[in-house]
Amino acid sequence: MKHLLLTTIAAVLLVGTVFADPIHDAVNRGDLAGVQAELDKGANVNAKMWRRTPLHSATAGGHTEIAELLIDNGADVNANEDYGWTPLHLAAKYGHREVAELLIAKGADVNAKKKDGWTPLHLAALYGHTEIVELLITNGADVNAKTEEGATPLHEAAGWGHKEIVELLIARGVDVNAKNDLSFTPLDWAASVDEEDPPETKAAKREISDFLRKHGGKTGAELKALMPRLVQHGRFAFSFDAKEGKIYEVQDSFDLLNWETIRIYTGAGDTVRFDEDRDHDPPQWFYRVKMVE
């Protein structure tokens, strides 16, 4: 009997806390009056259930009025669940423009990153939500943000056949030849057609490939072939062969991650030679040259 009583008490405690939080239940039902009632009782507006706050749930469900009520009562617009999802990530994923506008107006970070580096813009580009892509960019979203695997929003839009978003990103100055960690560009992703893709997706990706080409897009292999070979002569003397009329940037780095352009040359069909013996803090150990036009 004692064991049964303890088990029953434990079950009641669980029902009243993590597994059945009344404010979460009201949010998930889309019950505005129910949410207000729980707030009037003193419910914790940032209480988490299954890693999410009530605002996460309101955003995922597209419940704009509930989201506004929660924010007005102290909900954290930039709250993270365990994997780094913020409410704005969810609005971007599910295409809830009104909620996204509300969150941004209330101070949501448009460049917040999940643990894998994904921003709201990556998700909007992946799922084809053009209006949200435009909203995010207008409010300062980084069009060249990269995930942990090096993918940009343009990779996602190109790879999933969202031509309008590709056009929008390029119009906003995205790097058309950004490479991910496997050295694939957005053009590589657009050109990669899955046999299971529906006909309209295949057609869209062909159009995207042509559009990227018209705007200077190249595959990773093509970019590698265009990369001039930088030859080192002694410690600080370098040279490379430059094609006539092409523009080259010489860059240096101390960690192979952060590169800075230190010289720009216009090729004349000959060998460019230069010395680089400036003092650096921190010291620069790596140099490269890339053709930009």
Positions of the model-derived regions?
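Short, composition-biased motifs enriched in small/polar/acidic residues
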Residues: 221-293
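Conserved ankyrin/ankyrin-like repeat signature
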Residues: 34, 65-66, 98-99, 131-132, ...
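Ankyrin repeat boundary/linker residues
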Residues: 48-49, 81, 114, 147, ...
